[in-house]
Amino acid sequence: MAGAAAAVAAGAAAGAAAAAVSVAAPGRASAPPPPPPVYCVCRQPYDVNRFMIECDICKDWFHGSCVGVEEHHAVDIDLYHCPNCAVLHGSSLMKKRRNWHRHDYTEIDDGSKPVQAGTRTFIKELRSRVFPSADEIIIKMHGSQLTQRYLEKHGFDVPIMVPKLDDLGLRLPSPTFSVMDVERYVGGDKVIDVIDVARQADSKMTLHNYVKYFMNPNRPKVLNVISLEFSDTKMSELVEVPDIAKKLSWVENYWPDDSVFPKPFVQKYCLMGVQDSYTDFHIDFGGTSVWYHVLWGEKIFYLIKPTDENLARYESWSSSVTQSEVFFGDKVDKCYKCVVKQGHTLFVPTGWIHAVLTSQDCMAFGGNFLHNLNIGMQLRCYEMEKRLKTPDLFKFPFFEAICWFVAKNLLETLKELREDGFQPQTYLVQGVKALHTALKLWMKKELVSEHAFEIPDNVRPGHLIKELSKVIRAIEEENGKPVKSQGIPIVCPVSRSSNEATSPYHSRRKMRKLRDHNVRTPSNLDILELHTREVLKRLEMCPWEEDILSSKLNGKFNKHLQPSSTVPEWRAKDNDLRLLLTNGRIIKDERQPFADQSLYTADSENEEDKRRTKKAKMKIEESSGVEGVEHEESQKPLNGFFTRVKSELRSRSSGYSDISESEDSGPECTALKSIFTTEESESSGDEKKQEITSNFKEESNVMRNFLQKSQKPSRSEIPIKRECPTSTSTEEEAIQGMLSMAGLHYSTCLQRQIQSTDCSGERNSLQDPSSCHGSNHEVRQLYRYDKPVECGYHVKTEDPDLRTSSWIKQFDTSRFHPQDLSRSQKCIRKEGSSEISQRVQSRNYVDSSGSSLQNGKYMQNSNLTSGACQISNGSLSPERPVGETSFSVPLHPTKRPASNPPPISNQATKGKRPKKGMATAKQRLGKILKLNRNGHARFFV
């Protein structure tokens, strides 16, 4: 049979070509391969892209275009005779039609076989059937009403009909636009896919030949064109996609311009069908939604809702060998009929099963698009296509690749929504959960080889899946119950876009492009520029103005540490700068250290994602702290304690030292500490790390405040000539240099956490200026050590001059009971003899500790313990609201704003011999100044 021969033409030619290739034996010179065989009257080699037919007489192969045989005509030829053989044997013999209801019309019509879809008999029966009207389910609306906000709020789960083009954003040619105009814009030589409706089979032909067929009133067959995508042709300039389709489309919003995968073009199709063209029931590839606009003519849609039962029946029907013999509309409860007339536009949602009948010659335009509103259904349809082994030609191009792009961008979107204080929409959370499940499935060991090809280069699959898990878990914990991943929401919460106008983050979010996968890290020049501007401002100010500016700067920069979800709108705009300045010097930088730049990869924005995830986690932890504000009256004893501490500071007493040194005295304090230790052991590891880091930030605030006090000289000490109100002596500059270097070290710990320290700025502005004077000896004692404590370790510290040692622990006053608070006051009031005894015990302990800490180095344990640093300068822990004070343990020796310590006696040097030239503070300071003069400032870095 000539038709069967044409179907196997490719295999026969390929086999002949393979047999003609000779393989050289090892060690012998290979002869040049013979030329490939040639065929047809044109004597050209085999081309897989060109249709060929075999002559049943001479057995030679001919290109259909060379002998005037169309591909869709070849199936009707019984015996084919080539032009040479036709001279002797006559023309080709055609098949005889024996029925009108079967795809193979040569079958004998004995009435025993059912009608198949697409045949003439089937079309007649379909036209005569009665179906429920689609008016029961579809929504008719004006173009201006069809907005993204509407769909996000009400969902996109039923078809939408728009009778007019007004306000749709859809631009099309005039209704006089014909198929000949299509040929003129697209090109007559373009090869297109054509469906032979009676056989429900696909074939190829040129656009010119199809236009010729379309314009012929005597059409031997019913041919339908439904897949002419013209985005890469001149006709694309005549058509603009509806605005709603562009706003929702994954390809338009998430596909990166620099992707190695070619961008899918599925938004602009031209559909040309003659009367009685029929497309059987199907779901559009990849579960895409689709828009149709009838330019002229008419189309009838048969719509079936994608319920779980209907989808299961559809999959079973599609895989059946008798699919064409069963009308799927009879297998479901309801199949709705929707007539789309000239000028009407129909939007079909994800997963809807539909068939299309062209009731009269028609030209229509349409397009497919994936979107966020029904991600779960889209993935379900894609998995169904794979189970049904759908050919790649009928699948969405690079569906899995775009899922990775979308997952990466939706992760960013969810984090931004939670930072801005918006609750993510239900449909979005459901979609991300479905997407996360699909990505995990694709990355399984037994399946990863099938899906690895479509993983983008700039996506780290494992890391992305973990980050999605964290965000989903955090959202579920906030909502108090898991979010269901199945089903389509009928009513969605208010969209994020509806709140953008009132959001302080609107402009920032508007400027951010979702396709931007790179994160720019600020350079050191940016830091220096900001620092220089602040210093120049301060040089022009009086001392009292400087105090005000310092308090404002501290408050401003510390505000950035508060999670953005809890920052009021009037403070949200002051969070740009992250440098902490004191007297014109940088002592703390909250940004990512520059040293980490070498670790950045193509998707380095995940580092920023980690910080945002931690911000989101802290929202839950701070919720318990916010409740503490309501019980502020019950904590008056604790507030009274801090009032007394402030008064002691104003009188230059040793309030903090006394507290530190008398902390462990008395059984009541011991009992109180044990209670807190038990509660600490019950807290999670993440909470401990966050509170530890917040304590280091509080320590930095204490150092900054004390330095500002100590560097303001009394009137008798003001030099006659001053270049700047904040100028200091040479020794003070050296000490401040040490402080600046130490601050940079601490930033590596601080930059990973988010902590609110607003009250520190207020405290600076409220302190009495008369109490801001301190001796240089205090500064030397305060900043003795120059090696920072590693964040997250339980550290034992010893000060050889202060003769004190302390195990730094963490307490959380949000858990205090009134009895504990009164008990803590008793411990704090113990002074005098208890203070002296504590110092003696500390001195003895230092004497017996050996010389392990001779050079000011710390001993660090390798394992994390339940103890965590908590400093009492009034800063807030992650669970403490603004304005709530805290009961704290002894301050770290290098951060404690202690008063003048007792003189160093000879007893201090017993048990260990100090290093030569480093015995006293004066000798050590001289050593530091000498190093500065010799240009060894890098020693401190």
Curated annotation (Swiss-Prot):
The keyword Transcription applies. Residues 597-633, 677-700, 819-921 are annotated as: Disordered. Binds 1 Fe(2+) ion per subunit. A zinc finger (PHD-type) spans 37-88. GO terms for molecular function: 2-oxoglutarate-dependent dioxygenase activity; histone demethylase activity; histone H3K27me2/H3K27me3 demethylase activity; histone H3K36 demethylase activity; histone H3K9 demethylase activity; histone H3K9me/H3K9me2 demethylase activity; histone H4K20 demethylase activity; iron ion binding. Residues 97-114 are annotated as: Linker. Residues 834-876 have a biased composition (Polar residues). Its main location: nucleus. Its cofactor is Fe(2+). The PHD-type zinc finger mediates the binding to H3K4me3. Binding to H3K4me3 prevents its access to H3K9me2. Belongs to the JHDM1 histone demethylase family. JHDM1D subfamily. This is Lysine-specific demethylase 7A.
